[in-house]
């Protein structure tokens, strides 16, 4: 059986390994902050098959589309995908800027990923350039999803908005 690690343990490992301070207990945009190093970070756990070129499972980046003031199902039905992506970008930017507002010294936001490949683990991270979130756009779309261009380089992963789950998700390509 694969190893299962509770999110709380992952967060604590991150706190201990980088000397940061835990925040939010799951109800905040990031899991840790380091005001001395001026960053906040969110810890994410992903599973991956290990097959070269394959994607990991998904992790949620944002789930509160109702705050956009639009009805996601209607936007999909009317093929208003540019509006869907710009609404999600605005909401994600607002979510992450809350950290910078609450902690004035925070300048950078990171995602740290622990990727489980059976019994092996890989660690990677990415900086989120919050100011460039307004530049993301539609890559392609279907009746139930919108793939996002320019959130992450396509060789490293893909980001998608799922209509049915009403959330924005990220998958990584760990072998790349």
Label every PLM stretch briefly.
Residues 1-28, 45-176:
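Nucleic-acid endonuclease domains
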């Amino acid at each position: 059986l694969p190893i299962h690690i509770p999110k709380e343990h992952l967060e604590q490992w991150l706190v201990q390994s980088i000397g940061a301070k835990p925040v939010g207990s799951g109800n905040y945009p990031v899991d840790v902050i380091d005001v001395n190093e001026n960053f906040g970070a969110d810890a994410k756990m992903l599973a991956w098959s290990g097959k070269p070129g394959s994607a990991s499972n998904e992790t949620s980046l944002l789930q509160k589309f109702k705050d956009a003031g639009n009805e996601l199902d209607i936007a999909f039905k009317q093929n208003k995908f540019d509006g869907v992506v710009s609404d999600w970008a605005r909401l994600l930017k607002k979510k992450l800027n809350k950290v910078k507002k609450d902690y004035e010294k925070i300048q950078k936001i990171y995602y740290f990923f622990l990727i489980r490949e059976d019994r092996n683990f890989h660690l990677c991270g990415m900086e989120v350039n919050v100011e460039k979130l307004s530049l993301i756009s539609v890559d392609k779309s279907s009746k139930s999803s919108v793939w996002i261009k320019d959130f992450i380089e396509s060789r490293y992963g893909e980001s998608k908005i799922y209509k049915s789950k009403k959330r924005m998700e990220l998958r990584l390509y760990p072998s790349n």
